[in-house]
Amino acid sequence: MASELLANPTNGSGITRPDPQRTYQVVVAATQNMGIGKDGKLPWRLPSDMKFFKDVTMTTSDPLKRNAVIMGRKTWESIPIQHRPLPGRLNVVLTRSGSFDIATVENVVICGSMISALELLAGSPYCVSVEKVFVIGGGQIYREALNAPGCDAVHITEIEEHIECDTFIPLLDESVFQPWYSSFPLVENKIRYCFTTYVRVRNSVAELTSQTNGCSSDSKSDSGNFEIQNFSFLPKTVFEKHEEYLYLGLVENIISNGVTKNDRTRTGTVSIFGCQMRFNLRKSFPLLTTKKVFWRGVVEELLWFISGSTNAKILKEKGVNIWEGNGSREYLDSIGLTDREEGDLGPIYGFQWRHFGARYTDMHADYSGQGFDQLLDVISKIKNNPDDRRIIQSAWNPSDLRLMALPPCHMFAQFYVANGELSCQMYQRSADMGLGVPFNIAAYALLTCMIAHVCDLVPGDFVHSIGDAHVYSNHLSDLFETSFRMLPKTFPVLKINSGEKDIDSFEAADFKLIGYDPHQKIEMKMAV
């Protein structure tokens, strides 16, 4: 029954969703304290919001179908007469007033409640002719529908300014909804705002427990934890804005249009030159979902870089073996570092970040006070001179390249402060799209979040600029499967639990992911 969609979401097991008659999506604009109107009107003028509303509620995948919009009587009356009914959509008006008679108006139907509206739309002819159902107001309708089990998604224009309102709706229950997509901030008529779509991923807070994993463990994800596995019910214009499609589209472009090249490892690659991806860190964390990313490895390696260590054995002792190949006896001998102890990687990333210019001897030496500490310099400039255009950290030191087990691939980062937000652009000269790039995206997004935390800022953008973006020939079939067949899920949310403001005080347990439910791990061999 449709009434189940507006009632208790469970059937006794705590996680099983009732068989819906008709679900719906909510479209709303609201301030940070969920104000939506004043004196029966919108207290802001945002033409782009009107366009967004039209695009979301009118878009259908089947040109022979249309969408339905459910609204209360006051919302109907607030629409200018010349725009009533909203064109191209079935207008469902909720009212219990016997004097309200518009039944003769084309493309308009009247229902007494949300329950009766959903039941109507579940029956003939609307079950066939109506593709999606959107709830568009007003306050009482939103309060009834927003967090109810029948709500699959919420498309919200999030207004960051304080604007006086007299009508409010409940906060979105973020224990069961996660961001699918959030636009970069826009400013219109001096109002800063963004468009964010949240999707329902679970029915109850109880399900959240199994989704919340600290990085101290890397247990297998249970794909059954997410009630919804396929989010293609979203309007196409929203569905395709998921930021994972930046990565998937780049992989697809390389496979389809790349140039075949030889490489140092003699594996062979298909590559393109010069590309960029931009990720929004404000609402979610860009840990790819079409294949499982080794999150614990991301965290431990970044903390290892920050410590300035060049000893691969430290990572290996923690079960992180990503540097084992480049630190092996066989590999070090093959590049002429025959006197180097196994596991000693030379003056690579962490050394350059913390001791740039110091003379490298071996991984056991104490380099305290030696060289230039770029990381602390970055933090100092962000705190004391945030408008500086020289907030830069470089791992590329030409005089040390011959001493490194592997010259830096991700070699240069610049930080930028605006509107209380910290953004980072990283340049990567060589990008292994299969194994390296998912790791690199997560690592620099995490670094940005950590520095923002230390500097009392919030994360902004992570911009990933790539020189040679390539797919190794032995990864082609696996990445073809990922980029052409897998559908992304929601990115997780990152919580930093530490109250520490010292970049060197973080521990792996300080970072918690909420709602990471990726597809299965894809085994790919690393080219050494």
Swiss-Prot record:
A single Gene Ontology biological process assigned to it is: dTMP biosynthetic process
Q: Which SUPFAM superfamilies match?
A: Dihydrofolate reductase-like (SSF53597), Thymidylate synthase/dCMP hydroxymethylase (SSF55831)
- UniProt keyword annotations, A-Z: Methyltransferase, Multifunctional enzyme, NADP, Nucleotide biosynthesis, One-carbon metabolism, Oxidoreductase, Transferase
Work out whether the entry's keyword set contains Oxidoreductase: yes
Pfam families linked: DHFR_1, Thymidylat_synt
Domain DHFR, by residue range, is 23-200
User: What segment(s) does the record annotate as region Disordered?
Assistant: 1-20
Q: In which pathway does it act?
A: Cofactor biosynthesis; tetrahydrofolate biosynthesis; 5,6,7,8-tetrahydrofolate from 7,8-dihydrofolate: step 1/1
Q: Could you name the active-site residues?
A: C409
Annotated binding of NADP(+), by residue: 29, 35-41, 73-75, 94-97, 137-144
Q: Which PANTHER family match?
A: THYMIDYLATE SYNTHASE, THYMIDYLATE SYNTHASE 1
Q: What does this protein do?
A: Bifunctional enzyme. Involved in de novo dTMP biosynthesis. Key enzyme in folate metabolism. Can play two different roles depending on the source of dihydrofolate: de novo synthesis of tetrahydrofolate or recycling of the dihydrofolate released as one of the end products of the TS catalyzed reaction. Catalyzes an essential reaction for de novo glycine and purine synthesis, DNA precursor synthesis, and for the conversion of dUMP to dTMP.
NCBIfam families named in the record: PRK01827.1-3 (NF002497), thym_sym (TIGR03284)
**Per its record, how is this protein called by name?**
Bifunctional dihydrofolate reductase-thymidylate synthase
User: Per the UniProt entry, what species is this protein from, by scientific name?
Assistant: Daucus carota (Wild carrot)
